[in-house]
């Protein structure tokens, strides 16, 4: 049963903590830093699947990160809607075959490896190559907002 009073309260709920006073200025500044298209490489892969194009994309992320994504698109002269897939903690992007069902329905799919997780993306100079999946979620909690793990993840997504 729906509680109408609770539904109304949820519409204006702001969380348990106040938004920091410099929140908008911080993110405006971070987005300004990535406003130029990054260096990237887009490689097409021919899996001999009719009506589908498959690509691997790598691009330079923030703080010397290297971001990897797979892209699957229906062969079409028209614009198509695109689904962006981001895996959970300690995951990696979808397999090519997992993405194909969406192209049949007319959608493109972009599946990105989050830096420092189990995929091909790299977290720049802050971590060794390979899987560094534990502890990322709290990185920067002591060092400050410029060092936060998810700050760079969000900026990677913005660039994508």
Task: Pin down the residues of each PLM region.
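N-terminal targeting or regulatory segments adjacent to alpha/beta-hydrolase or S9 domains
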Residues: 1-52
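Long amphipathic N-terminal alpha/beta scaffold segment
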Residues: 35-77
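Short, flexible loop/turn elements at secondary-structure junctions
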Residues: 61-63, 87-90, 116
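Short beta-strand element of the alpha/beta-hydrolase
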Residues: 69-74, 78-90, 109
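Short, hydrophobic/aromatic alpha-helical segments in well-folded domains
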Residues: 82-85, 98, 160
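Alpha/beta-hydrolase active-site loop
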Residues: 128-160
């Amino acid at each position: 049963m729906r509680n109408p009073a609770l539904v109304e309260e949820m519409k204006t709920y702001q969380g348990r903590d106040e938004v920091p006073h410099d929140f908008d200025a911080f993110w405006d500044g971070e987005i300004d830093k990535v406003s130029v298209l990054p260096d990237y490489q887009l490689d097409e892969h021919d899996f001999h699947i009719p009506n589908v194009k498959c690509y691997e994309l790598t691009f330079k992320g923030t703080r010397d990160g290297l971001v990897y994504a797979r892209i699957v698109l229906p062969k079409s002269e028209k614009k198509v809607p695109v689904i962006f897939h981001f895996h959970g903690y300690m995951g990696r992007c979808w397999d090519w075959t997992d993405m194909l069902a969406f192209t049949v329905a007319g959608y493109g799919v972009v599946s990105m490896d989050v830096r420092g997780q189990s995929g091909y993306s790299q977290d720049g100079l802050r971590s060794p190559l390979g899987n560094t999946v534990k502890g990322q979620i709290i990185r920067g909690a002591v060092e400050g907002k410029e060092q936060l793990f998810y700050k760079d993840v969000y900026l990677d997504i913005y660039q994508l």
